[in-house]
Amino acid sequence: MNFMKNSLFQRNLEQEREEEMPEEGGVLAVWGSPSSGKTVVSVKLAEHLAKKKRNVILILADMITPPLPYLCAPSDIEQERSLGSILAASHVTENLIKKNCMFYRKNDYLSMVGMLKGENVFTYPPYEKEQAAELLQLAAQIAPYVIVDCTSNIASDILSAVALMEADTVLRLAGCDLKSISYLSSQLPLLSDHKWDADKQLKAVSNIRQQEASS
């Protein structure tokens, strides 16, 4: 991430024009049914913002199948740090997040937070919702855009559940198959409480196969 973006030594006319544009960022949680393309959409959105020279943090919440090892080569990452190190702390701080952000060498405006290859939910001590909330709140202070790639298992994934509650906007994805319908029928009742704020959810159909689109 280009933390030096506003430095006098880094400023040029193009950046000044960019900075004149209002920032309308926030925290976006991408959530939905299994195989609905949550990670792909999250990465594409983060990549688009980074190409527009917008600082963005992509938080990859999956601890069962960490996405980072299959998203980019190790050589594309400036330093390997783990999401687990952040959540294992008794209190999350801004400095702790910065130390554990993985910087993407191909674009200074994109950094990622996620589990590393070989790590899983038992690699680090269990965390509570307080650490997850602190991570999201402080990440939003570091970068104007924060995208959380949530898992589908919100009943046991604390970070994804907190992201759905704390995010400014939730992008809810669903596929055109019976599995997605079954998933939403099962999980949406869990979000009926007002704390989930269903009104902030943007609904989209994604990962549509050719035969599904024509049917």
Regions found by a protein language model. Give the residues of each.
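Conserved catalytic-core segment of NTP-binding enzymes
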Residues: E134, A140-Q141, Y145, C150-S215
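Anionic group-transfer/hydrolysis microenvironments
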Residues: W31, D62, L116, T151, ...
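Walker A/P-loop phosphate-binding motif and the immediately C-terminal alpha-helix
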Residues: E20-L68, A139
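Extreme N-terminal, non-catalytic leader segments
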Residues: M1-S33
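Phosphate-binding loop that captures ATP/GTP phosphates
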Residues: K52, V56-S111
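N-terminal regions of ATP-driven nucleic-acid and macromolecular assemblies
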Residues: E16-M21, G25-V27, Q79-C101, L178, ...
